[in-house]
Amino acid sequence: MALQRNREVYRSLNIKNRVLRDVSKRSTTTEIFGRKIAMPYAISPTASAGLMCDGGEVALAKAAARMGVPCTVATNSLTPMEEIVEAADGNLWFQLYMWVDKNLRMAFVERIKAAGFDTLLVTVDGSVGANREHDRKSGYTMPLRYTPKLIAGVLTNPGWCLRVLAPQYLKRGPFRKANYPAEFSSKLTDKPTDHDLTKPDTQCWDDIKRIRDVWPGHMLVKGLQSWEDVVLAADNGMDG
């Protein structure tokens, strides 16, 4: 239903062309949170980009900096947030999942602050794990499980092995969620982390308030789908 509705909305859009307007001076530049950006776009959280390209998360951040747009570092990034900040001078935001363990969650917020981020993007529509049918069909899991199907895929893609897999193991070892605290960090070859730890079904606006109370910078919520929740977000001190 959601897919059908999304397609219907896009099909209903029309471009209204106006003429005889002076467009000799035009710019896509705008400003958000007191900083100029080249266009009203930002790189969304892109976890596991390192599976596609060696140092993929760093490459994304550098590309965003060159283009003059924000880049959002993901909680599930394969590269530590501190390494991304050090490697890429740009407008970096951080995406946060509200873990079940509130002490771990708040300690993680402090780590994000210490790393130098000034904009926090809190994901609120992940109370349960996603039903990704294409992942089930392909056998892809997070963390990776070296099944016969996966091993066959790796062996038939020697280019990826040379460009991505080999550098990863030589520099960092097995793929892992680099930002996870030791208490429930797991290598991508270990048993998958329980969604009950990372996707709390008890999250509420009080959790947002606790983070807002300690976060000094800009704070956004990701995943709002109704105007009523937008109003609540504003009432709870969100910037967007």
Which residues make up each language-model segment?
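An N-cap/entry alpha-helix motif that binds or orients negatively charged groups
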Residues: 1-34, 143-203
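Glycine/aspartate-rich loop-and-adjacent alpha/beta segment that forms the canonical ThDP
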Residues: 128-148
